[in-house]
Swiss-Prot record:
The chain crosses the membrane at residues 19-39, 52-72, 86-106, 145-165, 179-199, 210-230, 235-255. Residues 256-295 are annotated as: Disordered. Homotrimer; conformation seems to be controled by binding to diacylglycerol (DAG). It comes from the Eukaryota. InterPro entries: TRIC_channel. Residues 40-51, 107-144, 200-209, 256-295 are cytoplasmic. Channel activity is activated by a change of voltage within the sarcoplasmic reticulum lumen and blocked by luminal high Ca(2+) levels. GO terms for cellular component: nuclear membrane; sarcoplasmic reticulum membrane. One of its GO terms (biological process) is regulation of release of sequestered calcium ion into cytosol. One of its GO terms (molecular function) is potassium channel activity. Residues 1-18, 73-85, 166-178, 231-234 are lumenal. This is Trimeric intracellular cation channel type A. It comes from Oryctolagus cuniculus.
Amino acid sequence: MELLSALSLGELALSFSRVPLFPVFDLSYFIVSILYLKYEPGAVELSRRHPVASWLCAMLHCFGSYILADLLLGEPLIDYFSNNSSILLASAVWYLIFFCPLDLFYKCVCFLPVKLIFVAMKEVVRVRKIAVGIHHAHHHYHHGWFIMIATGWVKGSGVALLSNVEQLLRGVWKPETNEILHMSFPTKASLYGAILFTLQQTRWLPVSKASLIFIFTMFMVSCKVFLTATHSHSSPFDVLEAYVCPVLFGTGSGGDHPQDNHGAWPGGPPSGALATKSKEELSEGSRKKKTKKAD
């Protein structure tokens, strides 16, 4: 805290945490979320043939984190849909991205410098949602650390965690794309951020919430803008995980097990090959015996 005061970041962080998200930041969040929906294979054809299904997918991209958080806390799943302003704004963005003449709106928001601004503003919303989700969970479960972490995590990455449900709405089933099995950078960052905000909420992290929001937002904005600008799908956590995971969890490689062939010795032929070889040897022995009898 002394360092933050010396750098005069305390007042800046407090002012930043009080900036309202609606409508500018929420608009950016909706634009980027529905852009990612349009990138999905078959999304454009779905919007032409089944516009209601396409709209539902867009709403899930925009509000999936709220739905999943309400599910965890036992609250009505459609509670957030009572916010008419947000629903209408997200619906307008969906219509412009998919149905604007000549794709003018889509081309404008996809222009890289403009898109980077929207991506940065979306990360501001993501971090604020994590902080609000943990505060909400703390109100119900004062000592439920894991509940607070889970709620903050889904508030930050609920859309990705519900990707399989969204795929079903589009008539696609890809269980191998489960986000928990293959976490993207935003999902991992939301989890780590949820842990940090939980420690701050329970007073184990000696920093104000406004300062933590500001610092973590700057980290998320910098990383996501860089990854988007370079069209990279890697994660800044990969280097750290490459050192930590083998120590804590082992190599995690399925090919390192010595008995992957159900009991066969490593380096030896598979059991099917051994069985085939044995049959060939028996057949050869029988043939030799018959030859001797004939002689």
